[in-house]
Each structure stands twice: as C-alpha cells, then as structure tokens.
C-alpha cells in the first residue's frame, strides 16, 4: 500500500519531474517542479484554487514517482519527453504527432525528394510543419511538382553514378532526370533551394525569376515555353495567395492565442515570415475549460514546438507562465536566441487579437460539427442498445472478420469503435496460424482466442506491475462484440469467451443475397432494424470497415507471396537476396525494369546474381 503521508514528507527540495499513477499503474499526469516537495504537496492540500479537472485527477491518484534533475531546465526537457512517451490522460495534449503531416525535403541526399511525412526523424532532412489540413498539404506538394522539375521516384540516386534511362516524367517535363545525368548536383540543388524559399514564404525572388524567363521566352517567340512559365507563376501565386502582407519588420515570428467555451479550448497559431502571414494552424484541446489560459498556452508551446520542424526567433502570446524557462528551452531547440513576448500596443497586439478572433470562430465551427456528430452517434448507440436490450450504451465496440481466397493467405481483422467513432489506433490484424484451408469458423475461433487470451495475460502483467497500462495492446475489453457472420460465427465467439470465463455480449452482422447489411443476430434471433435508422447506418459502417481492413491485409500478404514465388524461380537468388530485392524495389515490375547497375546497388546482389535476374526476365536482351 502506498504511504502518501510518508512519501510526501520525504520529497526532496530539489527540481525534478513527478509522475502520477492510478490503481492500474497507468501514468495519468506528468509535471515538472522547481522544488518537488512544494509542488507535489499542493495537489493533496484542500484548495479552492484546484480546478475540477485537478480534483478528479487527484481522486484517481494511487501513487506517485519522481525523478530529481540538476536544474529546472533539465526538468522541463524530461517532462516533455515523458509526456510524449506516456500521453497522460490529464495533461493538456495535442493529437498524437503521427496525426499531423509535415513536408519533408531530403536535403541529405545528392538529389533530394519532396514528400509528405507523418514523423520527424534526425536524418538530415528539412521539415516544414506540422500542418492540420492533410489535403492542403497534398495540394501544395502537387503544385510544387508542377512548378519545379524534381524527381518523385523513391530510388536512391548518387552523383556520378552510371546514367539510366529516364522515366516518362522527364519527357513530359515534370522531372529533370538526375537518374539519366540530365542535370548536375549543383543545378538540382538550386531547384531545391527555390522550393525551400517558397515554403519559407520567400516567393518574391522566385516570381521575379519566372516572370523574367517568361518575358524572354515570349520575346524570342517561344510561346509554348512562355505559356508553361505563366502556368508556373499562377501555381506559385496559388501556394502563396493566402499570405497577407501585415508589417514592415521582416522577422520570423509566430503569434499564438486562445479561445475557450464552457468545455473546450482552441489554440490558433499564425506563422509570419518576412512580413507575411504564410499559414495558420488550429488545435482543439478538449476538456480544458477550467484551466488558466496562460497555463494552456505554456503547455501548448511545449507540445507544439517539441515536435515542430521550425522554431521562430520570436513567439507572441497574450500571457504565459514559465516565460523565461520556456525561452531557454526554445533557444536550445532552435540553436539561437528565442524570445517570448507579450505585446501591449501597436500592430503586434492587433494581429494577436486577430488570431484570437480566428480561434473563437474555429472553436464555434468545431462545436457545431462535434455536437451534430455526437448527437448522431448517441442516437445510433441508443437505438442499438434498445434493439439488444442493454441497460447502458456500448461505449466500446469491437468487430471481427475473416478474409481469404480458397483458404490461401487467411487473415483476421479487428476494428474498434468508441462512442460511435472509429479508433484506428486500436485496430489489430491477425495472420491465421493454426487453420488449414478455408474454414471461417476455426479461423474466427483462433483470432478471438488469441485476442482475449493476450488481453488476460496483459491484465495480469499490469496487476503484477510488470507492464505499464499504456503499453497494453489488448488489455481493454469491449462492451459489445460484432462478428461479420451469422449464428454459427456468433456461437463460436460465445464458446471462446466461455472457455476464458469472460462475459461480453456478441452479435452477428448479417448480409442479404446482394451483400448489403440486413441486420444483426443476437441470442440466436435476427433483430429487425429499419434500414433508415441510425443504428443500421452505424452497423453498416462497422461491417464495411472491418471487411475493408481484412481485405487490405489479405491483399498485402497475397502480393508478398506472389512476389516471393516468382523470385524463387530465379537462379542464385536465396532468401536474403529475395528480401533485399523486395525491400529496395517493392514490386516485380520495378525489378524487371532495373538495370544491372541498379540491381548491383542492392545489398548482397553481386554481378552473377544481377545477370541471373536480367536473364530470367529478359533473356533476349542480354
């Protein structure tokens, strides 16, 4: 039993980080302190200043741990890392970093590529972001490829390597073909530099250059080239058309402000580069209404700039706690001095007020959509509860399906819906291991037994403190199981649950002859559901999703098997070489088209095996 009185007495009067845990050993809050003894004690003292959120959190604390650091700055850095690791329930969090796209430029390569990435790696690449609108980022990438003749292939191209035949993109002027030595490393670097400048908001020089080239082409009667350059100018303007000139001070500055309602907050960021607003992003922080605004902004800065690709010289905010400490931390992140400023007058405060207005509008729009969606989901779950005779709505629903073609590459899938919404982070896939041929019943038995047996084992490990709650992949059980199938499939599921001494209701999702969702079977009775009801729409969506997820995994396994079976017939190609070829080229078609030199770039492929591959696919060409 954790002795709170004793542990609070022995807390050190030093800086550090504290971790609050619940009865399941789950880390529910991470915080930093200049003096651990003073800060941690505050949570367990009666105070009117405690928000409702803090009171609820404290009621769930079963124990706490702490880590001593040499300074408050070290505590801040450690706090950021631990929050990123545990994603604690009561910390103010942005969506998982994986949800936000970045634009990545591989400037560490001889001939860099430009594409969308979900993560930042310390690989020497240049990143822009994070952005919240994936479709807008994708459109920007497509426009960049229209403006600049850069490569879109995934091949690794070295400067000075033997030239190969360019692809179609070169012939339609979408690529400068470094693979065929049609452009030097230095010439390609100039193109990449223009892209970096454009994404940084420095478009004036690019537009001037394109306009001069267009005039030269027009004067020399090269009208087709002039028209192409005109289109590129339009594309550049489309990328920058939302950029608004605001001030004469050419600084790299971010403006952060916040709007709140009775439940949630919206933090809006405006990015200013060279006197122009080059972009803005918003972040909805749910259940933060009782937090102080200056605290939310401080937490946001740690989370946002902890994963941001760029830290500006100046950050403007309406108010903030730990200002000087955060300035030091941002300075470390940037590599040069960063200031956090609270403007009181002039154009800076005017822009900050504009950011707040946008945050308020965004929050209102979010709330309207959220309430509409929430109402629909709640109605659907309420209808489903009535149909099944439940006292409470099923908060977590897990659905299962099996996919194979004539018993080959059998797979199972599990999708999860919480409060009516899909929760993709909890989706799981199963490769059938013990069943031969096409036997859906035995396959379903296998995946359900594996899923719930693993869940029981994880719960036991969590109870023994050998596993952190947040690390468990199967430890959360559903309120309802839906099986893609009829009575037979449902009975198989019930048998497995009975074997494991687990009580969870199971229903089957049945389809008619045209493969359209018809209804559900529960307690061996098919329930009549109106096709227009919200419950039917939810069931149909779940059934379509679990089927899609199973089919996609089945196709992946099938494609890998087909690739391997073809490569098995090539002399001198063993298991290791086969894996290396698939890793480098990805498809049989790419391997077929590869030159001897390209094949030799593959680890473990020597001249003899490269010749074997070429002879196998094109014996008449050697």
UniProtKB/Swiss-Prot annotation:
Keyword presence, DNA damage: yes
PROSITE patterns: GIY_YIG, UVR, UVRC
SMART domains: GIYc (SM00465)
Domain (GIY-YIG) ranges: 13-92
Biological process (GO), any one: nucleotide-excision repair
InterPro entries cross-referenced by the UniProt entry: DisA/LigA_HHH, GIY-YIG_endonuc, GIY-YIG_endonuc_sf, GIY-YIG_UvrC_Cho, RuvA_2-like, UVR_dom, UVR_dom_sf, UvrABC_protein_C
Residue span, UVR domain: 204-239
Gene Ontology MF terms: DNA binding; excinuclease ABC activity
Localisation per UniProt entry: Cytoplasm
Main location per the UniProt record: cytoplasm
Keyword DNA repair found: yes
Cystine bridges: none
Gene Ontology, cellular component aspect: cytoplasm; excinuclease repair complex
Keywords assigned by UniProt, alphabetized: Cytoplasm, DNA damage, DNA excision, DNA repair, Excision nuclease, SOS response
Subunit record text: Interacts with UvrB in an incision complex.
Family stated for the protein in its record: Belongs to the UvrC family.
Task performed by this protein: The UvrABC repair system catalyzes the recognition and processing of DNA lesions. UvrC both incises the 5' and 3' sides of the lesion. The N-terminal half is responsible for the 3' incision and the C-terminal half is responsible for the 5' incision.
UniProt cross-references to NCBIfam families, sorted A to Z: PRK00558.1-5, uvrC
Protein name listed in UniProt: UvrABC system protein C
Species this protein is from: Clostridium tetani (strain Massachusetts / E88)
Lineage: Bacteria, Bacillati, Bacillota, Clostridia, Eubacteriales
């Amino acid at each position: 039993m954790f002795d709170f009185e004793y542990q609070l007495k022995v807390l050190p009067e030093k800086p550090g980080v504290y971790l609050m845990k619940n009865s399941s050993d789950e880390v529910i809050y991470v915080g930093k302190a200049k003096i651990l003894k003073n800060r941690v004690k505050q949570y367990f003292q009666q105070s009117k200043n405690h928000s409702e959120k803090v009171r609820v959190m404290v009621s769930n604390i079963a124990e706490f741990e702490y880590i001593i650091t040499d300074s408050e700055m070290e505590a801040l850095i450690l706090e950021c890392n631990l929050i990123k690791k545990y994603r604690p329930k009561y910390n103010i969090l942005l969506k998982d970093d994986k949800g936000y796209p970045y634009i990545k430029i591989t400037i560490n390569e001889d001939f860099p590529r430009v594409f969308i990435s979900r993560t930042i790696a310390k690989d020497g690449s240049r990143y822009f972001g994070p952005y919240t609108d994936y479709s807008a980022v994708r459109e920007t990438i497509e426009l960049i490829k229209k403006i600049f003749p850069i490569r879109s292939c995934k091949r690794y191209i070295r400067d000075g390597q033997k030239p190969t035949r360019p692809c179609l993109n070169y012939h339609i002027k979408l690529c400068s073909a470094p693979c065929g030595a049609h452009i030097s490393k230095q010439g390609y670097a100039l193109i990449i530099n223009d892209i970096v400048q454009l994404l940084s908001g420095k478009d004036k020089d690019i537009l001037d250059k394109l306009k001069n080239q267009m005039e030269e082409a027009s004067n020399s009667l090269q009208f087709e080239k002039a028209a192409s350059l005109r289109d590129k100018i339009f594309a550049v303007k489309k990328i920058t058309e939302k950029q608004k000139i605001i001030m004469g001070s050419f600084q790299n500055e971010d403006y952060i402000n916040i709007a709140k309602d009775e439940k949630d907050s919206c933090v809006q960021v405006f990015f200013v580069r060279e006197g122009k607003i080059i972009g803005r992003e918003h972040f909805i922080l749910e259940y933060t209404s009782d937090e102080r605004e200056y605290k939310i902004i401080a937490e946001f800065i740690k989370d946002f700039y902890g994963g941001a690709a760029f830290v500006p010289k100046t950050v403007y905010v309406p108010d903030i706690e730990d200002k000087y400490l955060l300035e030091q931390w941002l300075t470390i992140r940037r590599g040069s001095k960063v200031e956090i400023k609270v403007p009181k007058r002039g154009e800076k405060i005017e822009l900050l007020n504009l950011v707040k207005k946008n945050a308020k509008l965004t929050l209102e729009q979010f709330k309207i959509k959220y309430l509409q969606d929430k109402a629909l989901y709640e109605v659907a779950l309420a209808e489903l509860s009535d149909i099944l005779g439940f006292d409470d709505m099923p908060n977590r629903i897990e659905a299962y399906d099996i996919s194979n073609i004539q018993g080959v590459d059998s797979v199972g899938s599990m999708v999860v819906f919480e409060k009516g919404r899909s929760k993709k982070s909890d989706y799981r896939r199963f490769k059938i291991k013990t069943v031969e041929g096409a036997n859906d019943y035995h396959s379903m038995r296998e995946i359900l037994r594996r899923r719930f047996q693993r869940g029981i084992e994880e719960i036991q490990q969590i109870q023994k403190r050998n596993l952190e709650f947040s690390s468990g992949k199967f430890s959360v059980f559903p309120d309802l199981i839906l099986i893609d199938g009829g009575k037979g499939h449902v009975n198989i599921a019930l048998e497995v649950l009975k074997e494991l001494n687990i009580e969870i209701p199971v229903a089957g999702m049945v389809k008619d002859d045209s493969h359209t969702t018809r209804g559900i079977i529960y307690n061996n009775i098919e329930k009549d559901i109106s096709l227009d009801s919200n419950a039917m729409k939810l069931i149909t969506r779940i059934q379509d999703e679990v089927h899609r997820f199973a089919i996609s995994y089945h196709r992946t396994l099938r494609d890998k098997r087909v690739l391997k079976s073809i490569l098995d017939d090539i002399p001198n190609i063993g298991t290791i070489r086969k894996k290396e070829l698939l890793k480098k080229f990805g498809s049989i078609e790419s391997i077929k088209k590869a030159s001897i030199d390209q094949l030799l770039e593959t680890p473990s492929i020597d001249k003899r095996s490269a010749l074997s591959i070429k002879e196998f696919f094109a014996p008449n060409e050697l």
